[in-house]
Amino acid sequence: RVAGCQFDIAVFTNFSEDHISEKEHPDMKDYFESKLKLFKMCDNGIINVDDLQVSKIPRLLPENKIMTYGIDNYCEVLAKDITITNSYVDFRVKVSDRNERVKVDIPGRFSVYNALAAICVAKKLGIASDKVIEALAEIKVPGRSEMVPNKKEIPIMIDYAHSPESLQNILSAVKSYTRGRVI
């Protein structure tokens, strides 16, 4: 589908069975090799070092300029002091030798990872960190971790999770700030 194309930046957020099917990739090996092909078509790569499979990429493609991000492991763009509520995530990140506070109005640890990836892309493209942090604070995705206001103040969230991994991500996010059952 992309033969002959050259890309500026490739981002590998995580490696899961989301794309294993008759229509996409027959197995995890094929899926990973496809991702490697994409990275070979790019001068710059951005990877989540907290994902074990993804963190292998710099060794496999030493010629690429790889930027790393994460929460738990050593990397170039690292989130610290993370707060996750039922309506947002807030964290500190070091960008261009400055510590910045980042707030994204989509709850869940996955939102921290997505924001870190966006910060890395912006940095590679030469976009000022304050601009990307402003943009992240404005993100609203209808149907994605969307809180529903109601008179009883019961936490109700709409989310379009459509795969086992995305469903697990949102359920983990919700469970972290609720008591009892999550329906």
Model-derived features with residue positions:
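Conserved phosphate/oxyanion-binding catalytic-loop motifs
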Residues: 159
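Acidic, Mg2+-coordinating active-site environments of NTP-dependent enzymes
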Residues: 2-156, 179-180
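Active-site beta-alpha connecting loops in nucleotide-dependent enzymes
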Residues: 141, 164-183
